[in-house]
Amino acid sequence: MEQEREIVFSLSPEETSELKNGVNLISRSEKEKFVIYKDPTAENTVEEPATSHMYKACLNKCKHQGGTFIKDIEDGDNCILRCTKHGWKLDAKTMRYVNPPDSFSQQQLVPEYNEDGSLDIVELKPPQPWETDKRDPMPLEVGEVQITYFTHACIEIKLGDLIMFTDPWLIGPAFARGWWLMHEPPADWLDRLAKADLIYISHLHSDHLNYPTLELLSQRNPDIPIYVGDTSMPVFVRLEQSGVKLNNIHIKKFGKWIEINKDTRFMIMMDGVHPDMDTCALIDYKGHLILDTVDCTNPNGGRLPIGVDMMLSDFAGGASGFPMTFSGGKYTEEWKAEFVKRERRKLLYYKMQQVRDVAPTVYCPFAGYFVEAHPSDHYIRSTNTKNDPDALNALINKYSPNIKTWSPSPGAVLDLKKAIQGDRDFITDPPRGTQKFKDSWDFEKYVNAINKNIEEEIFSYPEWIQFYYKWTGFKNYNLVIRMVERDDDFCPVVGGYDFMVDFVGEEPTFPTERPAREHSYLEMENRIGVHRETVRQGLFWDDLYIGFNNRISREPDTFHYLFWNHMQILLPRTDPDWEGFLRDMKTEGAPQKAIWNPSQATPAVEAKDPSSDSKDSATKPGTHWNYERLLRPLGIVVALVGVGVAIWKSESK
């Protein structure tokens, strides 16, 4: 039986707006009683509005003996509930029992805030799919089950005679050119990956679905079985466009055992916050369970198996341009630093609590080992601090000393049998002298490949702007965006475009000035290579904002969920027809932009690009000074003066 999402009850937009900050007790009938907690501190981020993580929900039923909760009159923060049977207390903000302390966590329902302002409370059914055909653990031998860490979220799992890999990002960048591998993978990674029996890929982000890695894999073994979840946004939605040949992709329903052999099976489960794209996996070998929650914010709606043999999850944070790439208003360096510090600490404690709830034999923090290594992203690297895996493991050990923890190094191997029986040597580190951290990334190869898009002929016709934004399909939203193309360091670039798009109507319009009506305004300065690659290939906008490839300001300072959600996962699944566009332009005899490619720039035209619509002199493309060309004649003059002075001195002696 596959897992399905079922709406338990709904609140209308009016009922949702009437929810108070803190605890709300809702009774639909004697048997239908619920708790909804509304977090007044929830904030918008660049990836999601506050409403997506503002609410928590559960049945109004104590986990101890089924009593009903009432508000605790001693609680001044409006988050503590007291059971009428035995006085147990639940903190609705964390969904953990605080009396008795360290006892249980409450099983949660999944709140989903809708576009019309209504709120659905959803339950995954069956809520605990791993209970279906449950198996008792069988004895293991040393060496029978081994987990080898490679990089980021990529591990090799030996399950008897079977080899399974997860999320292979082992070469090249992710999110265009924004993320680079922190760790150097084992030297034989490609041989081992190509010989694997199966691969699980959790979702479509390029630090998990990495086409540079998969391209090399496909040349060795295009028929390797690859398993993905049946998400509404398909993991391999851009496979054909990528040119990578993979012939054995399996799309699987959620919460259903996938039988590999008599000893090995696994299931894919959805995320409660991002069910349209994020998944996690539960692996069962002879009744021993390995839980890989990857990037899921609320894996399986918060209901996870207890007492698994091993758990792996993300931990680091920093997987977004917010707030480092934002400017204006409150976004001072001090505000950013405080925000990052606060959010990383919250994430650290959230992950600690999640691990304690699952109570695995051993826990491994992973899926956070990336670095903003390119020199042009030095600012991001210095400000986008991330959690330390050792700090998380120390926190877990402080409150749950029985949980073993592992901060992995590439090539290190965990033996599950040794971990279960309590051996201290359950980890085998790679040989001394093995390189752990990468110190070379082949920047030029990958950045040049991206920047080839700058020279695509479509950008010689300004009409590409109208063609592309009509293709996106986003409309009927009172938002004006300004898109400005910049160089790698976000300085003006000759031939770059600078334009506005207004989405208020059935079709976008393209004003040269901001409209007089009241409207939301979003301004983005984008690296020209990444911007043009995104446009030409019809890619999701993740490369721009998760990859730190733009700089953003907005008026008012509001997160526009509908816009970002559309550009992130709702773009058309067919590419823009650029061949047809070029054919039409040439048939119509459309004029080309005077300068549309920085390589065309000459001193004569560099002072002004009349094809660009100017908004202000500080940001107008094509109006900046080229200091190298200005200083070249000056250098000649200085040299001539120097020669003259030398001659004068020699003659005066």
UniProtKB/Swiss-Prot annotation:
The chain crosses the membrane at residues 630-647. It is a single-pass membrane protein. Coiled coil: none annotated. It is found in: Membrane. Belongs to the CMP-Neu5Ac hydroxylase family. It is an enzyme of class 1 (oxidoreductase). Residues 596-622 are annotated as: Disordered. Residues 11-120 form the Rieske domain. InterPro entries: CMP-Neu5Ac_hydroxylase_Rieske, Cnh, RibonucZ/Hydroxyglut_hydro, Rieske_2Fe-2S, Rieske_2Fe-2S_sf. This is Cytidine monophosphate-N-acetylneuraminic acid hydroxylase. Pfam families: Lactamase_B_3, Rieske. GO terms for biological process: CMP-N-acetylneuraminate metabolic process; N-acetylneuraminate metabolic process.
